[in-house]
């Protein structure tokens, strides 16, 4: 191989690396801006429900309020409790924030269509379109509890430790139900690639969508518990635990927890859109709606689910802890197990398993 070819290969490698780096930076910036304006949206929606105005001073209609809040958090004094484990105390919010961002690596925001040998090949727009995208995102979401446990233990506070224990047991309990709901989707699509799942779901008959609808409801409610959102925000119950596992945090460490929590909230709604609501495709497969880019539909669906999260926070009272655990283990777990068996049986009986009928995924990637 000549030096010229080696130089061309090196330039190609540098170019692909630069493109990947730009993708990563773009996703991180987009998530951070989304978190900032999700907080603004939450305050505005709750204010409207409670017949208030909400943020309306900083900028037109209060649109610059998120930046004012960010400046306030940055310039606040950073206090470390005297008897805390200082290293773990500082590492915990970094773990939570980092894991919240890592999950976005496999999320497809849309897709490009290219023609190859007469076929229209659909290429999902994701940082990494890996073969085990579902397993990756489940693993990343499961690791998030470590940051909370470390924060509660290292703070040397009874309130923080109790909040961390609550959060750990709650997240572990509802991850089982979330995993089983995703299993039903995998049975119907036969793929662990998030992009293939979206397109396979798009090409399925409507009766399979109706069959998976109860699992979508369980996934959505379990997502509230998984992200410690109302009415399952027991780890952060202000009336019981002051603020929960992050009670001793201030300034940027608190901001990292805050960013991680809301980034996880957006992420799990993006997962719901991918698994149950058609991803980047327009609703009901209406032809003229395809004029609108897929990423716009994806964002609109995620925003709609986030609005439901906020609406629930403003209207439904908090569960007791025993009710929370009972709902997860005594209601959602048996129903999820039963529905996995039911979906498997119906797919086998109707000869609709992906192993027997490949048209969904093959049509997905070679349309």
UniProtKB/Swiss-Prot annotation:
What Gene Ontology molecular-function terms does this entry list? NADH dehydrogenase activity; oxidoreductase activity, acting on NAD(P)H, quinone or similar compound as acceptor; quinone binding
The record's section on InterPro entries has:
NADH_UbQ_OxRdtase_su1/FPO (IPR001694), NADH_UbQ_OxRdtase_su1_CS (IPR018086)
Q: Where in the cell is it found?
A: Cell inner membrane
- PROSITE patterns, per the entry: COMPLEX1_ND1_1 (PS00667), COMPLEX1_ND1_2 (PS00668)
One GO CC term on file: plasma membrane
Mind listing the UniProt keywords for this protein, alphabetically? Cell inner membrane, Cell membrane, Membrane, NAD, Quinone, Translocase, Transmembrane, Transmembrane helix, Ubiquinone
- Membrane association type: Multi-pass membrane protein
Where does the sequence pass through the membrane?
19-39, 87-107, 132-152, 178-198, 204-224, 266-286, 291-311, 328-348
EC category name: translocase
Q: What is its EC number?
A: 7.1.1.-
Disulfide bridges in this chain:
none
One Pfam family for this entry, by name? NADHdh
| Reactions catalysed according to its record | a quinone + NADH + 5 H(+)(in) = a quinol + NAD(+) + 4 H(+)(out)
GO biological process terms, alphabetically, are: aerobic respiration
Subunit organization: NDH-1 is composed of 14 different subunits. Subunits NuoA, H, J, K, L, M, N constitute the membrane sector of the complex.
PANTHER family found in the cross-reference section: NADH DEHYDROGENASE SUBUNIT 1 (PTHR11432), NADH-UBIQUINONE OXIDOREDUCTASE CHAIN 1 (PTHR11432:SF3)
In which family does this protein belong, per the annotation? Belongs to the complex I subunit 1 family.
Q: Which NCBIfam families match?
A: PRK06076.1-2, PRK06076.1-6
User: What is known about what this protein does?
Assistant: NDH-1 shuttles electrons from NADH, via FMN and iron-sulfur (Fe-S) centers, to quinones in the respiratory chain. The immediate electron acceptor for the enzyme in this species is believed to be ubiquinone. Couples the redox reaction to proton translocation (for every two electrons transferred, four hydrogen ions are translocated across the cytoplasmic membrane), and thus conserves the redox energy in a proton gradient. This subunit may bind ubiquinone.
What is this protein identified as?
Answer: NADH-quinone oxidoreductase subunit H
In which organism is this protein found? Ehrlichia chaffeensis (strain ATCC CRL-10679 / Arkansas)
Q: Which gene encodes it?
A: nuoH
């Amino acid at each position: 191989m000549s030096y010229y070819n080696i130089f061309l290969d090196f330039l190609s490698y540098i170019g692909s690396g630069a493109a990947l780096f730009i993708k990563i930076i773009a996703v991180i910036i987009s998530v951070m801006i989304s978190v900032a304006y999700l907080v603004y949206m939450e305050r505005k929606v709750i204010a409207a429900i409670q017949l208030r105005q909400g943020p309306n001073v900083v900028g037109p209609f209060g649109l610059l309020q998120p930046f004012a809040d960010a400046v306030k958090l940055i310039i606040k004094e950073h206090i470390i409790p005297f008897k805390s484990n200082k290293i773990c105390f500082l590492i915990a919010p970094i773990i939570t924030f980092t894991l919240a961002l890592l999950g976005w690596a496999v999320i497809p925001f849309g897709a490009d269509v290219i023609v190859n040998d007469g076929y229209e090949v659909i290429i999902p727009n994701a940082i990494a379109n890996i073969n085990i995208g579902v397993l990756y995102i489940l693993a990343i979401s499961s690791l998030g509890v470590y940051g909370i446990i470390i924060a509660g233990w290292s703070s040397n506070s009874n309130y923080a430790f109790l909040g961390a224990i609550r959060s750990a047991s709650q997240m572990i309990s509802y991850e089982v139900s979330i995993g089983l709901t995703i299993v039903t989707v995998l049975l119907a699509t036969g793929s662990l690639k998030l992009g293939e799942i979206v397109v396979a779901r798009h090409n399925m008959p409507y009766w399979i969508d109706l069959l998976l609808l109860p699992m979508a409801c369980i996934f959505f409610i379990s997502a509230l518990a998984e992200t410690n959102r109302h009415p399952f925000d027991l780890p952060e119950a202000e009336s019981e635990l002051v603020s929960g596992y992050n009670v001793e945090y201030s300034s940027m460490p608190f901001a990292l927890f805050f960013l991680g929590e809301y980034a996880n909230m957006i992420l799990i709604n993006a997962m719901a859109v991918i698994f149950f609501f058609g991803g980047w495709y327009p609703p009901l497969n209406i032809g003229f709606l395809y004029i609108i880019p897929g990423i716009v539909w994806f964002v609109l669906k995620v925003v709609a689910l986030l609005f439901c999260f906020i609406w629930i926070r403003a209207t439904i009272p908090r569960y007791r802890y025993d009710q929370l655990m009972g709902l997860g283990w005594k209601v959602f777990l048996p129903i999820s197990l039963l529905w996995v068996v039911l979906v498997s049986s119906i797919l086998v009986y109707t000869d609709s398993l992906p192993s027997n009928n490949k048209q969904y995924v093959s049509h997905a990637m070679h349309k």
